[in-house]
Each structure stands twice: as C-alpha cells, then as structure tokens.
C-alpha cells in the first residue's frame, strides 16, 4: 500500500465548530506537535468567514460542496462554493490529489461521544479505524456513504482519511475535555501513519464494530412543514443505542408518543443535532455490523 507523504488537518469546515478551529490554531503555533519524521503535515482553516461570524456557513454547507461537477463549475459561485474550489486546488484535485490523507475535525450537539466517520471502505481507513478503536474503546466508527452516489464531503477529495466527530457540545464554544480528546485522536493517528510508513505495524486481523448509515428521519410535520413533535425523552441522548420496534421515538406537542414502527431494530445517531433542523433531519438511522479487518 502506498505510503502517505502529505497529510492535511482541517478545522472549521463548519465555522461554529470551535474545537477543530482552535486545534488548527494550536498546531500552527506549535507545529512540532504534528511533525513526524516521514511525512509532511499541513493545517487548514476551511471556512474563515464562517468562523469570524460564528456561523456554520455563510451561504451553503461547505461539507456538501465537493461534488466534481460543482468543483468544475465556474458560474456565479457563492462563498462556500468558492472555498470548496480553493480547497480542492490546495489539497486535490479530487480524484488525483496532492495530499494523501485528510483529517477533518468536527463537533456535534448530539451525544455522539468520540466518532470517526468514514466515506469509503479503503483498506487503510479500516486499518487505522481498527487501531484507533483498540486504543480508545469508546470510539465509534460510523460509515456514511452510498457507493452508488458521489460523496460530497471534504474527505472525498482523497481516498484515505476520515472525519473526527465529537460531542455533545454546543455550537460556538470550546469544551476542554472534548478538545483534548480530539487532539489525542489526532496524535494517535499521526503516530499510526508514521509507523505505517516505516513498515513497523503489526498485521491487523480482527473484528470491528461499525455503524452503517441506512437513512435519515425527519421530524413529524404538518403539510405546511411545521414541526409537530420532538425527540422523545426516552430516546434523547441515546446515540448508538439500539432502538427496537415499538419503542418511543417522538413526543408530540400534545403529549402523544410516536413509536418506531419498522420491522428491524436500528441504532440512531446525530439525534436532535441542532444543525440538522434546517436539513429536515431528526436523526440518522444506522445498522450495527461487525466486519473483519
């Protein structure tokens, strides 16, 4: 497998997620923290205007702007579309990138704990995910892609890499424990890559648990699009926990319970994520699987 020569640590893809932004600032002030012997690491603040205004984005979600067709479009670009083109020129181009690995740092208001999000099943991504989960037993691995549909996340610029997602944390703030937990995952990842480049890694052959994205679920709404129910208290904060048929899912404003009614159990994630209200997403449903790496 090809060695990694250039790695990017990206923060602030969403301008109100301060953990990644201030880690990038820290690494820029103390570059020795991310320096390794056999590959080059660079940092990037992805959405500086969003950060300045403490907004997730100015015009559109930057982490949905990396479709090849959009990157090649030069007509009337908004701010995030222009940033996506700049980032693609810096790290990419998508499909033939200058960088070999992208670490994209995120936070969530949902109770996701420590999560890494994979946008493909590249063998190297599975190996590093397996190693990280062995070092951090509470780490969850969420696979969020459809092999038949082009992924538009910043991580899709190159095959190797993943997003680190930590929570719960409010938008626009820092929280020391999650800051240092994120930094620890970054450091462990860099050490793993250094050892990989040196050929010093033991062969990894074990089962890991992944949470495979199935679909998103919207809030119950009127025909005019008004929300009429909230996440049920029994489900709130239970990300990565099993939701079985017949269990409470939503609670209406007149105190009526709406139950999960599909045939098979699921494991919801991003439950009640603040940034997803505008997207019509109350939660994402996943299937818990064990795979051999």
UniProtKB/Swiss-Prot annotation:
Zn(2+) binds at residues 14, 17, 106. Keywords: Hydrolase, Metal-binding, Zinc. InterPro entries: AspA/AstE_fam, Aspartoacylase, AstE_AspA_cat, Aste_AspA_hybrid_dom. Transmembrane segments: none annotated. CDD domains: M14_ASPA. GO terms for cellular component: cytosol. Its EC number is 3.5.1.15. Binds 1 zinc ion per subunit. GO terms for molecular function: aspartoacylase activity; hydrolase activity, acting on ester bonds; zinc ion binding. It catalyses: an N-acyl-L-aspartate + H2O = a carboxylate + L-aspartate. NCBIfam families: PRK02259.1. Belongs to the AspA/AstE family. Aspartoacylase subfamily. This is Probable aspartoacylase.
């Amino acid at each position: 497998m090809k060695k990694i020569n250039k790695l990017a640590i990206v923060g602030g893809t969403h301008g109100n997620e301060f953990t990644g932004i201030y880690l990038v600032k820290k690494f820029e002030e103390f570059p020795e923290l991310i320096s390794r012997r056999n590959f080059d690491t660079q940092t990037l603040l992805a959405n500086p205007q969003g950060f300045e205004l403490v907004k997730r984005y100015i015009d559109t979600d930057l982490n949905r702007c990396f479709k090849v067709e959009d990157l090649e479009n030069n007509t009337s670009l908004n701010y995030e579309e222009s940033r996506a083109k700049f980032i693609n020129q810096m790290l990419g181009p998508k499909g033939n990138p200058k960088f070999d690995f992208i670490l994209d740092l995120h936070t969530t208001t949902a109770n996701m704990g420590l999560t890494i999000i994979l946008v493909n099943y590249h063998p190297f991504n599975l190996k590093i995910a397996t190693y990280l989960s062995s070092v951090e037993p509470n780490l969850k691995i969420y696979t969020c892609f459809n092999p038949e549909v082009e992924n538009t996340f910043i991580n899709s610029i190159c095959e190797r890499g993943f997003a680190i997602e930590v929570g719960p944390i409010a938008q626009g703030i820092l929280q020391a424990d999650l800051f240092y937990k994120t930094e620890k995952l970054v450091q462990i990842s860099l050490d793993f890559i250094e050892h990989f480049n040196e050929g010093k890694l033991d062969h990894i052959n074990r089962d890991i648990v992944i949470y495979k994205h199935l679909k998103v679920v919207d809030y119950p709404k009127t025909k005019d699009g008004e929300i009429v129910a909230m996440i049920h208290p029994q489900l709130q904060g239970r990300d990565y926990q099993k939701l079985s048929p017949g269990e409470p899912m939503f609670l209406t404003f007149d105190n009526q319970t709406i139950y999960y009614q599909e045939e098979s159990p699921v494991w919801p994630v991003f439950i009640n994520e603040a940034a997803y209200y505008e997207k019509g997403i109350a939660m994402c449903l996943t299937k818990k699987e064990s795979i051999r790496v």
